[in-house]
Amino acid sequence: MQIRAYLAWAILVIFPAAGCSPDNATEPGVSGEYIGQDDVTFFGAGKVARYQQQSDGSLENIGLLFFAEIFIAAGGEVTDASIQFPQPAGDIRDLLYRHSESDEIGDVMYLSGNADTVDELDRNFPPAEYVFKFTTGSGNIINQAVSFNDRKFAKQPIIIFRQNEQTIATDQVDPTVDLVITWPPFTEGRADANGVLDDLIFVAIDSCTVEDIVHSGRPFEKDDYLTFRAKEYVVSAGTLLPGQEYSMYVEHAILADTHDVAGIPAFATLAASTYMDFKTTGAEDPNGCGEQP
């Protein structure tokens, strides 16, 4: 995530905008209008339980994350993006634009916040109704309420590295060989009864200078994204540089609710992300990070 929000969703329920939205808002799809994904691939809100995995495989709790995000399609445009909090009354916060330097994922409008405990997270981001409002490049106003419900987080994944069909230490990654990243089965994962999107798995790797030099893909942006059925993700030989330190995460995301809003998907999850640092073997590549100041 850094704070790593990418598609870690919380429980999301889409309600009709009437009766809970700001005045003079346009409800998408009320008269059969189809907007589609030319500007926005999807949007939603989430809560994520985050842990750091140590070299011995143990996990350290590093707190929780709330986020609200609008994922912008390539060449798309979003303006006037905000989210109305359930309390205090009239608490409307702007979503900020964030450009992605990665070739793997696109830009977002976002808001995020951290907490040490679930109770603190719920105090700062109550499990109640939030209202997304934004304007697409085509001039359509999306105005939809989302509501958090009381559900459990996914079980925290454990990250396992394998090369040449052998489990390896996280400081012994050979960059000239395919790296197989795996994890225990995502047993809580399930197919989506609505047929919109099944529960998801994400894998991402950051270098010291660029986030997401590797990303398993977000739905609607990459065809071969991972669902709960996936057992591994392969980083091809030559992707990583020798003699470098990288950071990564594996996330298991339960999509508790899925909807299609005038052709724009909206989801939510309670997700579990495990972060880990690892090193590649070999002499330091001159194109790598080198000694940091």
What is each residue range found by the language model?
Residues 8-17:
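Bacterial N-terminal signal peptides
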Residues 17-41, 284-293:
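Bacterial Sec-dependent N-terminal signal peptides
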Residues 28-120:
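Solvent-exposed N-terminal domain segments of exported/luminal and surface proteins
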Residues 59-60, 169-177:
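Short, solvent-exposed loop/linker segments at the N-terminal edge
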Residues 81-116, 198-241:
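Recognizes extended acidic, P/S/T-rich segments that occur
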Residues 142-143, 255-290:
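Extracellular fibronectin type III
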Residues 173-193:
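Conserved aromatic anchor
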Residues 238-260:
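Beta-strand-rich modules
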